[in-house]
Every structure is written in structure tokens, then in C-alpha cells.
């Protein structure tokens, strides 16, 4: 097998959550370009159907499925739909997640729990649901999308940062549970220029963020997609339980506020 062949995903079936835009969309398209059939899942059906259409341009099969990952029944339906169409599941990307910056003095326990459920519990549930099918298929790979907020001290991220830190540790623990047949890894992106980040950045905020980033540029969704492709591919066959930091070299918070 050539070096380039080790990055091929031909014969694989992938579920990517949060695939309607940003990082999730970029990962879904990268997996499709590498040869995988892709199920694009997100709450907005129109968005994921559009991404699925883009994925098909690479000569693979793709499907858009409406799914709120916080809803257990919808996760079951997502897995069932994937199996009914493709017959197997070998790759999963738990990308859906997020939470707005929060002032802990004005954050209810319910809001904190909701952030944890959205970012951690949903990823655990979907991983547990697909793992038996990966084992039946002979193995698989799970990639969890975390955040640099999981390791930096920064203001107003006590809900999101705590949840992503928990996701990191869950990644390590599931890697031990599922080895050697299923590899489980994570990616901790830094500042990625997406629709989710853009509303928080004005010209001054962007300049501060760039100044705090050694590479002096914002990351793009494709930077994370390339990393996710590596982790899913045979090229990473000996990598599990790891969190790859893709953050422009930042070793402290780049949040400008």
C-alpha cells in the first residue's frame, strides 16, 4: 500500500454530526473525497441535504438526515437509517456541540447540564450505539471534536470548556474500552473561522486573536477536516486515545475578551 493509499477511506461508511456547516461540513466532504459513503446529520435537514449533494460529486453515496443529538430517540433513528441504507457503520465523527460564553454568576444548573449533555452525553450515547456495528464490520474509528477551551484558562467558558475537557477524558477512556478493534481520538481546534465564531469577532477582536496566535492566522474548517481524515484512515492505525491540538501553535487562550 502506497503512502497516499493509507489515507483512503474507500469501503467505509461514516456518520458525521453537525455536518450542515463549518467543521462538520468540511469533514463530511473530506471523507467523501477520500472515498467514504457519508451520512450527514444535523438539526436542519435542508443544510445537510445540500452537503450530501456536494459529497456525491466525489462519486460516493451520501445521505442527509435531520437529527438533534440531544434526543436519544433521534440518535437511534440516525443509526437505523444509516444501517438501512448502507448496511454498516465504520466511522463516526461526533462534531455536533457548542455553547455560548457564559458568566458563571448568571448560569443556572440546568444551563450547565444542557451544555454538558450537548457536548459530552450525546457523543457518548452515539458512540455506544455505533460501536457494536463497527465491531460487526471488523473495526472502526471514532473522532470527537473538542476545543482548545478544554485546556486553557479563559473567562466565560466554564460551561463549554468544562464539557470539552470531559469529552477529552471520555475519548481516552473509550479508546481503552474499545481497543483494539475501534480507535477513538479527538481534535482540539483553536480559533477556526466559522459561522459560529464570526458573530463574536469584530475587527479589533480579530486582530487581538491573531496577535495571540503564533501562526498569526485563523484556522479554517479544512484544517480540522484534514486532521479528522488522518485519524479515520489506515495512516493512523496505531493512534488511539489521543487529542490532537490544531490551534496555530497557541499555548494559552486566544480569546480576545
Predicted region positions:
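Short C-terminal tail/terminal secondary-structure segment
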Residues: 2-5, 152, 229, 240-257
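C-terminal helical subdomain
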Residues: 186, 207-235, 239, 246-248
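Alpha-helical segment proximal to the catalytic Tyr-Lys
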Residues: 132, 175-180, 237
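Conserved glycine-rich cofactor-binding loop
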Residues: 13, 20-22
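Active-site helix of classical SDR
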Residues: 127, 163, 171
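Residue(s) in the substrate-gating loop at a strand-loop-helix junction
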Residues: 147
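Substrate-binding pocket helix/loop in short-chain dehydrogenase/reductase
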Residues: 103-116, 197, 209
Amino acid at each position: 500500500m502506497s503512502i497516499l493509499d493509507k489515507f483512503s477511506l474507500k469501503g467505509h461508511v461514516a456518520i458525521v454530526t453537525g455536518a450542515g456547516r463549518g467543521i462538520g461540513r468540511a469533514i463530511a466532504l473530506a471523507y467523501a473525497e477520500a472515498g467514504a459513503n457519508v451520512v450527514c446529520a444535523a438539526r436542519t435537514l435542508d443544510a445537510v441535504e445540500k452537503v450530501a449533494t456536494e459529497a456525491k460529486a466525489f462519486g460516493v453515496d451520501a445521505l442527509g438526515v435531520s437529527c438533534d443529538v440531544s434526543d436519544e430517540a433521534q440518535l437511534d433513528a440516525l443509526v437505523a437509517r444509516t444501517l438501512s441504507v448502507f448496511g454498516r457503520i465504520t466511522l463516526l465523527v461526533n462534531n455536533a456541540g457548542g455553547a455560548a460564553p457564559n458568566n458563571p454568576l448568571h448560569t443556572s444548573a440546568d444551563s450547565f447540564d444542557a451544555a454538558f449533555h450537548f457536548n459530552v452525553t450525546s457523543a457518548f450515547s452515539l458512540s455506544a450505539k455505533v460501536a457494536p456495528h463497527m465491531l460487526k464490520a471488523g473495526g472502526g474509528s471514532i473522532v470527537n471534536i473538542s476545543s482548545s477551551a478544554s485546556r486553557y484558562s479563559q473567562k466565560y467558558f466554564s460551561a463549554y470548556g468544562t464539557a470539552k475537557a470531559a469529552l477529552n477524558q471520555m475519548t481516552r477512556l473509550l479508546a481503552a474500552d474499545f481497543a483494539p478493534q475501534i480507535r477513538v481520538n479527538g481534535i482540539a481546534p483553536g480559533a477556526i473561522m466559522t459561522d459560529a465564531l464570526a458573530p463574536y469577532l469584530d475587527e479589533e477582536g480579530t486582530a487581538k486573536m491573531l496577535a495571540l496566535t503564533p501562526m498569526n492566522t485563523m484556522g479554517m474548517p479544512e484544517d480540522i477536516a484534514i486532521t479528522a481524515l488522518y485519524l479515520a484512515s489506515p495512516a493512523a492505525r496505531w493512534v488511539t486515545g489521543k487529542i490532537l491540538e490544531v490551534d496555530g501553535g497557541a499555548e494559552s487562550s486566544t480569546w480576545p475578551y
